Amino acid sequence: MDYKNLVAERIKENTELEVDLIEKLIEIPPKKEMGDYAFPCFQLAKTFRKAPNLIAEELKEKINKEGFEKVVTVGPYLNFFVDKTILIKDVLEKVLSEKEKYGSSKVGEGKNVVVEYSSPNIAKPFHIGHLFTTAIGNALYKILSFEGYNCIGINHLGDWGTQFGKLISAYRRWVDEEALEKDAIGELLRIYVKFHEEAEKDPELEKEARLNFKRLEDGSEEETELWNRFKDLSLKEFNKVYDMLGIKFDSLAGESFYSDKMDAVVQEIDDKGLLVDSNGAKVVMLDEYNMPPCMIKKSDGATIYATRDLAAAIYRKKTYDFHKCIYVVGTPQALHFKQVFTTLKLMGHDWADDCKHVGFGLVKLANKKLSTRNGDVVFLEDLLNQSVEETLKIINEKNPNLKNKEDVAKKLGIGAVVFTYLKNNRERDIVFDWKEILSFDGETGPYVEYSYARGKSILRKAGELTGEADYSKLSSKEEFELAKLLGGFNDAIMNAIDKLEPAMVTRYIIEVAKAFNKFYNAHGILNAEDNDVKLARVKLVEATCQVIKNALNLLGIDVVEEM
């Protein structure tokens, strides 16, 4: 039984509101003694022509209370107390029958969602800031797919632009081929930095770079061969990180993919009478939307990010006919995306309303203990490797005889980092602190993983238990609160989809782990007072482990069975 839906159905029987709307209005009371669900009656004031508190009293008398312990009013709220035995039985049976599918639905069936995320720049470091977009995008992809949406994950590589003309010049002058083979990104970064240093002394280098990029745009064989080499070397490095994170993309169509599609977009904008000359540049004026102009072409005729993003959006709509197109890009780009989406609307593409920018904050280091390859950029691969090493040290201290400890350290160490990126509101900055991230106490990945491993240990010791569980034996506050939380998994997922915020799932699973440990500390499980209680509690542990595993999988985190 879905109690939230039952509350909505009972209210619908006595009002003109639809179930979907009622479910959105239902709240969880701030204090447990106030009930399990609360319905605010403000929405009914116009229909009933009464004060909300009087409506609540009237509904309390009319409503069918079967399945509830009681229904009470608290001012303008109608509060429901569920029948605890029914709820526990329904939730645990549902979790244990649906297993890895528990929490999923078909709400997104038949709807395509494009998720653009990660998108590192070719020949540039894949640094710790990139994990924000990568982790958020991967989690949204998994969450949406879990709810039935057909997701298309796009890694919109930064593989085009005048910087490649500079890199070609730098390569021809200063590359160390041996260093390039050993550390491609490090060497490409070194020569790129050197180009900028030398260009300050010799402005002719900038002209040469522009000419190189012009040749690349025109399809010159020599420049194209170098560009492809830079791209292949970079992707080889990037894929090391994606393999560590277990991430695969459906498309690697980056900026270069749209290079032959931009002229048509510029022409379409011009045909609509939107293109305006501004000091030699071509722009779309957005004054009436309180935004600066959206630049389409620079004064030298070159296209910029906005042109490419317009071309990409139009291509994606034609190719995937998306229900939503999500851009997981840093918050500083918020204005850019507002300009792009508004320009699409002015071009007559009303589907621009289905394009959503998902912003995120910055990553800061709590201290400078993390070594860098060139003094200022922290490579993501180094960060993940260091996390695995630090985790292995902790395992060697706590449980040196653990089987497969290197594999456990890898899952725990990488999972701990990803969990940190997804723990709080995505627009908040992250302060990276090893001590906190790898702690087994508090709101961390290792704490949740430890809770799961603790549960699995109980299940291994319990062995195969026969007979049907009597869930009426789960009568304590801790047991009810844990079961009730498990029943709210789908709500957490739907909130994450509604807000495009994976932290809704992360925060939820932290609460589940806390509730599980409260239950574990308050009650004997394997040494319960009788076999009926033992069986019911073991089933509660099994359901908890299933929900934790499902939730961590949605976040792109592997579970560890033992630690």
UniProtKB/Swiss-Prot annotation:
Give its E.C. classification number.
6.1.1.19
Q: Which SMART domains match?
A: Arg_tRNA_synt_N (SM01016), DALR_1 (SM00836)
Q: Does the keyword Nucleotide-binding apply?
A: yes
A Gene Ontology annotation in the biological process aspect, one of them, is: arginyl-tRNA aminoacylation
Q: Which residues form a coiled coil?
A: none
Indicate yes or no for the key word Disulfide bond. no
Enzyme type, top EC level: ligase
Q: Which PROSITE patterns match?
A: AA_TRNA_LIGASE_I
Q: Which keywords has UniProt assigned to this entry? A: Aminoacyl-tRNA synthetase, ATP-binding, Cytoplasm, Ligase, Nucleotide-binding, Protein biosynthesis
Q: Where does this protein reside within or beyond the cell?
A: Cytoplasm
Output the superkingdom of the source species: Bacteria
Q: Name one GO cellular component term.
A: cytoplasm
Q: Name one GO molecular function term.
A: ATP binding
In chain numbering, motif 'HIGH' region lies across 120-130
Pfam families assigned? Arg_tRNA_synt_N, DALR_1, tRNA-synt_1d
Q: Which residues form the signal peptide?
A: none
Q: Which reaction does it catalyse?
A: tRNA(Arg) + L-arginine + ATP = L-arginyl-tRNA(Arg) + AMP + diphosphate
Predominant place of localization: cytoplasm
Q: Which PANTHER family match?
A: ARGININE--TRNA LIGASE, CYTOPLASMIC, ARGINYL-TRNA SYNTHETASE
Indicate the family of this protein.
Belongs to the class-I aminoacyl-tRNA synthetase family.
Under the subunit heading, UniProt states: Monomer.
Q: What is this protein called?
A: Arginine--tRNA ligase
Native organism is Clostridium botulinum (strain Okra / Type B1)
- Quote the gene name from the UniProt entry: argS
